[in-house]
Amino acid sequence: MTRKEYLTKIKEHLRNHKREWFNSLDIVDGKTVGLKFYGRSIQRLTVNGVDFGGMWDIPTQKAFLAEIEKALDY
């Protein structure tokens, strides 16, 4: 899956499933990405086995997606 497709998948979940967990392990542009979040709080974010930790109560969807993009650039 491409980076754009992956971010679209996350945006869709944020819009349509605000009170549900998102838990996935995907291949994004050749990188293994593990992500678990609820609302705008990231429980787990890993890229190729490197753990980027958790972040709580990220204020906006734009900032939330920016954190994920920053990890994808690793």
Predicted feature residues:
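Negatively charged, low-complexity tracts enriched in Asp/Glu with abundant Ser/Thr
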Residues: 2-26
